[in-house]
């Protein structure tokens, strides 16, 4: 049993990092709530502060360490997430407790499966598997999380039911690579999707990030499984580079053409859909030619969402000692790619003007507005007297930098 489980405490909670990591710590906190603990608004009120951490790049890791130090002045601190697994030893302090990899894996494989969801608002998603099947040379996440461990379908659908019983209407399933789900237990992601969408309740399902290599193996069945009206037509598939030489150096285990085939088939089946991808700029060996190949891929695929990250050398990875390109070149490439994608998204959003959308209201916005999601998971800001999880129709009358603006009809 993890420390603090079974004890009634006042909890202050902060979560950083990927959806998977937040989902896991959300389950942990819900486990404590089920034992009688409660959430407070400030660390000064808390018996313990729980912080979920991220170390994907060095600046983020530094911010995590600083924040942990700040929290430790107010209460005891429980550190979760990837920092605890890759650099937990740097946090030695009588007021700081680290959830070790062994401890969390034991908790994950047992006690998390039957957690009652007391507070759905802190749940970023439902984790479906730990670890991954990849061996990317730059990735510290696989170092932190280890080999693939998939959760049984019935445990996942059980937690979906709990969220729905608490009034949630948007369900997210998440992992480092959702397309890897079930490879270790003789089942695959499309089977899980069908099990979830077969539930009778009214909800929408968003499937989290999936890697190209595993997606290619299940593509046809996956696209069949998401045909349900309960599934957002949304695909997050990180490509990282549009240059084959760089992909090979990264040990990504797929080709540029593999990625393009996935995108092409997804959009053929679901023309009104949203594609999200990731690019890394400044990976070791990248030059102007390889960067231009990435720009060409960005132009050809025109993703609605594009996360662009400057390469950061991370300890315990094969590429830690390999030098990246000059920082001035990387800065230039990052800005050029970001500017180009802003033009893409501007055109994409403007093309939606005058269209009519059915929305699920998923969050409160600013200045008397609400934010809803259309069937492709586009965010739409709508003014009006609405409520969380209302279903509405609206006309698109404009857009902001990354969202649409709707008018109730």
Descriptions of predicted regions:
Residues 2, 98-126:
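N-terminal [4Fe-4S]-dependent radical SAM core
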Residues 2-106:
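Cofactor-cradling patches in redox/metallo enzymes
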Residues 68, 72, 160, 190-194, ...:
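Generic structural signal for well-ordered alpha-helices
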Residues 78-81, 86, 165-287:
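Conserved SAM/AdoMet-binding glycine-rich loop
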Residues 121-154:
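Canonical Radical SAM [4Fe-4S] cluster-binding loop centered on the CxxxCxxC motif
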Residues 156, 173, 207, 237, ...:
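Conserved, mostly hydrophobic/aromatic
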Residues 233, 245-361:
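A structural motif corresponding to the C-terminal lobe/cap of the Radical SAM core domain
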Residues 321-409:
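Terminal RNA-binding accessory module
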């Amino acid at each position: 049993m993890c420390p603090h489980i079974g004890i009634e405490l006042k909890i202050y909670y902060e979560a950083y990092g990927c959806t998977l990591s937040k989902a896991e710590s959300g389950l942990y906190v819900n486990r404590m709530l089920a034992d009688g603990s409660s959430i407070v608004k400030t660390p000064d009120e808390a018996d313990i502060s729980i912080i979920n951490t991220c170390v994907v790049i060095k600046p983020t890791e530094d911010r995590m360490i600083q924040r942990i130090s700040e929290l430790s002045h107010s209460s005891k601190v429980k550190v979760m997430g990837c920092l605890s697994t890759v650099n937990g030893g740097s946090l030695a302090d009588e007021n700081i407790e680290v959830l070790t990899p062994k401890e969390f894996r034991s908790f994950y494989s047992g006690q998390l499966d039957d957690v009652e969801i007391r507070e759905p608002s802190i749940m970023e998603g439902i984790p479906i598997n730990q670890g991954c099947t990849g061996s990317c040379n730059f990735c510290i996440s696989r170092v932190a999380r280890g080999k693939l461990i998939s959760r049984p379908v019935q445990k996942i659908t059980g937690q979906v039911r709990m969220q729905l019983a608490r009034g949630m209407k948007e369900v997210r399933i998440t992992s480092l690579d959702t397309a890897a789900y079930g490879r270790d237990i003789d089942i695959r992601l499309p089977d899980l999707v069908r099990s979830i969408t077969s539930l009778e309740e009214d909800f929408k399902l968003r499937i989290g990030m999936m890697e190209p290599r595993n997606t290619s193996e299940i593509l046809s069945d996956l696209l069949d499984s998401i045909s349900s009206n309960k599934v957002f037509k949304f695909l997050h598939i990180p490509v990282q580079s549009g240059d084959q030489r760089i992909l090979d150096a990264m040990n990504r285990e797929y080709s540029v053409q593999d990625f393009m085939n996935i995108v092409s088939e997804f959009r053929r089946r679901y023309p009104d859909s949203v594609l999200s991808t990731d690019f890394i700029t400044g990976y070791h060996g990248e030059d102007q030619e390889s960067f231009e190949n990435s720009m060409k891929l960005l132009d050809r695929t025109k993703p609605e969402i594009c996360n662009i990250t400057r390469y950061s050398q991370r300890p315990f990875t094969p590429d830690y000692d390999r030098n990246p390109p000059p920082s001035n070149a990387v800065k230039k490439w990052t800005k050029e790619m970001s500017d180009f994608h802003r033009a893409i998204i501007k055109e994409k959003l403007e093309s939606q003007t005058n269209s009519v959308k059915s929305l699920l209201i998923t969050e409160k916005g600013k200045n008397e507005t609400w934010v809803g999601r259309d069937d492709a998971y586009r965010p739409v800001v709508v003014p009006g007297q609405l409520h969380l999880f209302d279903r509405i129709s609206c006309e698109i009358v404009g857009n902001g930098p990354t969202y649409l603006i709707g008018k109730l009809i």
